């Protein structure tokens, strides 16, 4: 059946497996970020040595033309690897991901590199975030920036899907000037907002939406870390977006919609009974405390099973926390010097009751545990002075270090921000009278000495 001259040719394909090539060269930035952040790579030579242990290195000589290796000699291979590694490290340095000291050949990971490695975010996405996020970025901007992440380029685009996306886009509140229906980033932009609006979607788009949601929280957490590292208080907006993503609600929606079976009608009934949030609903559902309990239950129109579901949410899931704090030496706070605040958070539980940290999120595709951010900020200057991410069990005691840059009286806010529930945040304020720092005193003394010297020079001239 097969000519003898081609027999060996076909036997090769039957007897030998097809080669699987490496694509590490396309993702080397991400690999280096992970290894540099964990201190596995600390120099250029470490990076070159690391690359020799990869499958990419094994395939280089086996299929050099695929990787653009022109000279397969030892010197040619060494030169190829050195150039590839040095170019990659230079890109990371220019993106302010690492600090590269060429004199002693050391590589130091910078904060963006640590963020990218911790949240498993690509180098290109981190570049986008670092260039786009600033003190003026608001909710719309964060949604646009997050959905521009390269992680969403894997979203499938189907034929005639643009018509459905167009109809969804007409119903969502946040618009952009460049509405490209053939872009995976625009699709992510539309489907994320559809999630906030709790829209019913076709099964294919629902699967795409799940893919988007599974990656959104890490991207938002990275936005929080980037903005907070720059001292921008609008990091709170990214935290609120995290809550919106988990609960499938807009920031303008009632927090009561987190309660099972609470639709617009039930929310309207609750509002008419002067119930605006989940905590007020908890109080109102106590028949011993609320004389109008019977009318409220009747007007809500929920069945006994639905009321039981609502009670389970308020009793077992929605957090009830007591936040208290104590300033350390408030009278000795000086500008530019570290100051401290002791924080205590107590969860309202019975003695024999264990804290439930599992989040009630029926619209979120994966299970999630409850986490919180503690933030010290100043609203008047939009400054974030301290931040810590914590998990709160039965109780938590911790200390935050903050630095106020300017002397004078400052009204600061201690924010306790949930990453998953809307309406559970707390934001008590406190005042600090900040004295002049040592640097300021030294500057004043230097100015006085300069003035005295000038005066002496004038006297000598006379």
Predicted regions and their residues:
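C-terminal helicase lobe
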Residues: 1-81, 88, 124-125
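Exposed beta-strand face motif in extracellular beta-rich ectodomains
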Residues: 408-412
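Short acidic/polar inter-strand loop motif in beta-rich domains
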Residues: 350, 416-426
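Short, hydrophobic beta-strand segments
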Residues: 389, 396-407
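C-terminal helical accessory/scaffold domains
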Residues: 30, 35-38, 76-81, 86-272, ...
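Long acidic, serine-enriched intrinsically disordered low-complexity regions
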Residues: 436-462
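Solvent-exposed serine/threonine-rich low-complexity stretches and specific carbohydrate-binding patches
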Residues: 383-393
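Short amphipathic alpha-helical segments embedded in low-complexity Lys/Glu-rich regions
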Residues: 65-70, 108, 283-305, 417-419, ...
């Amino acid at each position: 059946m097969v000519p003898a001259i081609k027999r060996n040719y076909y036997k090769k394909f039957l007897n030998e497996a097809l080669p699987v090539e490496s694509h590490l060269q396309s993702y080397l930035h991400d690999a280096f970020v992970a290894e540099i952040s964990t201190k596995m790579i600390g120099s250029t030579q470490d990076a070159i040595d690391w690359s020799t242990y990869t499958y990419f290195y094994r395939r280089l000589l086996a299929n050099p033309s695929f990787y653009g290796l022109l000279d397969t000699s030892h010197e040619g291979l060494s030169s190829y690897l050195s150039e590839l590694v040095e170019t990659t490290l230079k890109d990371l340095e220019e993106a302010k991901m690492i600090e590269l000291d060429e004199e002693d050949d050391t590589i130091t990971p910078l904060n963006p590199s640590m963020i990218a490695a911790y949240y498993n975010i690509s180098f290109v996405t981190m570049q986008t975030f670092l260039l786009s996020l600033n003190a003026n970025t608001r909710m719309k901007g964060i949604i646009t920036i997050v959905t521009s992440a390269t992680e969403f380029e894997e979203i499938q685009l189907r034929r005639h899907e643009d018509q459905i996306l167009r109809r969804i886009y007409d119903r969502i509140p946040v618009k952009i000037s460049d509405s490209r229906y053939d872009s995976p980033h625009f699709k992510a932009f539309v489907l994320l907002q559809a999630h906030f609006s709790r829209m019913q979607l076709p099964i294919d788009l629902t699967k795409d939406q799940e893919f988007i949601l599974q990656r959104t929280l890490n991207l938002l957490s990275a936005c929080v870390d980037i903005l907070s590292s720059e001292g921008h208080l609008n990091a709170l907006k990214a935290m609120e977006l995290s809550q919106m993503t988990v609960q499938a609600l807009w920031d303008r929606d009632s927090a009561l919609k987190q309660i099972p079976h609470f639709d617009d009608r039930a929310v309207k009934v609750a509002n008419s009974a002067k119930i605006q949030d989940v905590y007020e609903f908890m109080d109102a559902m106590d028949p011993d405390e609320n004389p109008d309990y019977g009318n409220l239950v009747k007007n809500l129109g929920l069945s006994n099973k639905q009321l039981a579901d609502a009670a389970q949410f308020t009793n077992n899931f929605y957090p009830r926390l007591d936040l208290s704090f104590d300033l350390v030496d408030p009278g000795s706070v000086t500008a530019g010097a570290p100051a401290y605040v002791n924080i205590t958070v107590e969860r309202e539980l019975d003695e024999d009751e264990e804290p439930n940290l599992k989040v009630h999120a029926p619209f979120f595709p994966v299970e999630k545990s409850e986490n919180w951010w503690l933030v010290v900020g100043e609203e008047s200057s939009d400054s974030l002075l301290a931040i810590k991410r914590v998990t709160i069990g039965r109780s938590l005691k911790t200390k935050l270090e903050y630095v106020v840059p300017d002397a004078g009286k400052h009204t600061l806010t201690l924010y306790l921000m949930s990453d998953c529930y809307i309406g559970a945040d707390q934001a008590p304020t406190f005042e600090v009278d900040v004295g002049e720092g040592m640097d300021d005193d030294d500057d004043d003394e230097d100015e006085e000495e300069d003035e005295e010297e000038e005066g002496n020079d004038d006297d000598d001239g006379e």
